[in-house]
Structure formats: structure tokens, C-alpha cells
Amino acid sequence: MSNMKAEQQYIDLFAQCEDLVCRHSTPVMNALRAEALANFERLGFPSTRSEDYKYTDVAQAFAPDYGLNINRVAIPVNPYDVFRCDVPNLSTSLYFVVNDTFYDKDLPKAHLPEGVYAGGLKAFTEQYPEIASKYYGKAAPSSKDGIIALNTMLAQDGFVVYVPKNVVVERPIQLVNIFRNDVDTMANRRVLVIMEPHSEAKLLVCDHSIDDVKFLATQVVEIFAEEGARFDYYDLEESSVSTTRFSSVHVRQAASANVLVNGITLTNGLTRNNYYVELNGEYAESTLCGMSVLDKEQQMDTYSHITHAVPNCTSNELFKNVLNDHAVGVFSGRILVKEDAQKTAAYQTNRNLCATREARMYSKPQLEIYADDVKCSHGMTTGQLDENALFYMQSRGIPRDEARMLLSVAFTSDVIDHVRLEALKDRLHKLVEKRFRGELAKCAGCRICK
């Protein structure tokens, strides 16, 4: 790639390597590439002139020269040999994506019920092309924005969770995304979750960057929860200050489906998280949470859009950020209640702490309501730690730095309290405390991070 216009270098790359991209993928994924290319040429990267991307220069993030593993060259490491996610009292079915390739060698026994699929997207589309075609790219069409179009154009693999009707997966499924390379690297990841009626599962995704080079990730997550399904999606980002991530999570819920999405960022460089939730069946319930702890010049940009399309649905949204040094936080959240969506209950809250004068937080909560029989609210506050509380704690013999840490931990605790896995909840509380103490560079439970 060269220093030409950011979009053009990817268009030229695809023109040169389209055959290789398709050869190392499958017909289901390849069928969407031409349309994705056309949409990317039309849309380009979102501009800071757009209100939704006002504080994040996307084109600048994509402009540098990143390497892509289009030939799917194997990474000479077995992550099962070097990686251990040590959460006490939590047993998971563990899988890995290295850069953007599902690691399909030496897979351990999955402990999954009959009919459940957890594994590579490429393999899933080959084994179950009809199911894959029904869902892949449907919640996140490439016409939605230029980053999704780019991802759809270039993605060759990813991860799938498929749970048949009436099946309950008791053991959580864990996916670890590992960035590892000797050169600056770009990865285009996909996650597809298909929950058939009255099924249940939980997915924990952990992002790690191992090496000191620059990494750039685009990630598109599509979650389909059919009638009565129950699904939890936990996204823990512990990458590095040289990692940039653009993630879009798209959730479609049918009647009585219950979906929890909780994103926690403890270490990053620049992160943009988009969340799109569609409540398309009555009595569907959505819980959308997130928090970040930022310092140095880290940036977290969160955008959410929840659509209430039918009556009697509930959504609860809570995002919090703690910013130190010159960190930047952005939150833009919109709840759309359509005319037919009577008896809607929708609540949105954004709370932020700026621990230094140099830290910046931009927040824009929004309600767009076309129904008249609803219960909706939104609220935003940005401030600093309570000096009276700090003074009181110091008067009781608690050092000021310790008092600041304890108040910061308490501020973020309600986001973690939404986690519906007790062992994971306990570990996250401890990780957040370590982060505030400055003791956490990466998850201490991982051999590869020690």
C-alpha cells in the first residue's frame, strides 16, 4: 500500500488480489464481495464531517501501510500450548482466532451438546451453506457504512456459534482473538451467532495484542436471537496502545428473545464500538452495557442505535468511562421508538469521570419517539471525583491515591454487575481494580501475557 487516498489503496489491493481472497474463502462469503466493493467505492470511510464520527478520523487510522494475510499463511504457534485464561471456577469451551484466521488444529474436546456448532466461519459456510447464506451479512449489510463494506470485501474467516432449537449450552464458549506478527498487521474478523428458538448460550470474546508492532482490526458481529432465545455476549478488550479496532455489533431479536451485550475495555489504543439492536418481536428484552478505563492518549468512541419496532419490548442501556491523562471518550446513543411500538420501556444512561483537566469526554444521548404510550428516559453526566468523598476517606486514614482508586472502582462496578456469570464477574472486578492501581498491563491469567 502507498500513501494515496486511504480508500483507494484498499480498492486497488482488492483488484490485485481478488482471486486470492476468494480462493482462500468460500462461495457464501465470496457472493457478497462485489456488492461490498461497490458500496465501499460509494461510501468510502466515514468522515469527521458526519455527526456520528465527528471525533474519530477513520481515514487517518486506515491510511498507514498494514500487511494482510490474504494467502492465509499459518502462524507458527499453537495458542493452546502458550495461552491459558485462568478465571477461577469458570470452565469454557475455548477457541482461538490468530489475527483473522480461525485456529483449527489440535482442537480440544468442546463439551458442546449435540447439534451445537462453535468454530470457524469458513468451515461452517462449507458444511452448512444454506444456513450460512440465510444469516451471513443480513444484520450487517455492506450498504450500512464503509467500514462494514471493507470488512465484507476482505474477510476470509471468522467464528460461528450455532445453537439449535431448545438446546441449552451450559458451559460458556470463549473466543480469544490474538494479534501476533513481526510487521504492522490488519485483520478483518467476523463473528456470526445463530440462536434458534428457545436456545441458550453465552460467548466471551477476549482481544489481545502480543507483539509491539501496530495492529488494525475491523470486526463485524452479527447476532440473531430467534423466539425465546437467550444469549450473552461479553467483549473484553485488553490489547495495546498500538492497536486500533473498529467493531460493529448487530443484534436482531425476535419475540421474547433476551440478549445481553457487555463490552469492557481495559487496554487499547483507539477503539470505535458500534452497537445496533433491533427489537422485532414483542416482549423482547435487550441489555446493552459498556465501560472503559482510559489513560495516556487512548480513545474510546461508542455509538449505539436501538430500534423498538414492535410493542411491549424493553431496552436498558448503560455506558461508563473513566478518563485520565489526555484520554478522549465519545458516546453517541440513539433510541428509536417506532409508531407501532406502544408499551415500550427504554432507558439510556451515560456516566463519565474525567480524572484530569486534560481528559475530554463528548456525549450525545438521543431519543426519537413516535409512539405515545411509552416509558423512556435518557441521561448523561460528566464530572470529576467527589472531593468531599475523597476528603472524608482521607480523614479516615485512607491515602488519597487509594481513595481515588476505590471511588473509581465503585463508579464502574454496576456495569460489571450486569455480567450473568459469577466467576467472570468476580474476575472482572479484580481486573478493573488492578487497572486502576496501574498493576495491569495485560490479563495476568494468560501465560502468553506474563
Language-model regions, residue ranges each:
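N-terminal amphipathic, basic helical "cap/leader" segment at the start of enzyme domains
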Residues: 2-149, 318, 324
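Conserved beta-strand/loop scaffold segments within soluble protein domains that form the structured core
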Residues: 114-117, 121, 127, 131-398, ...
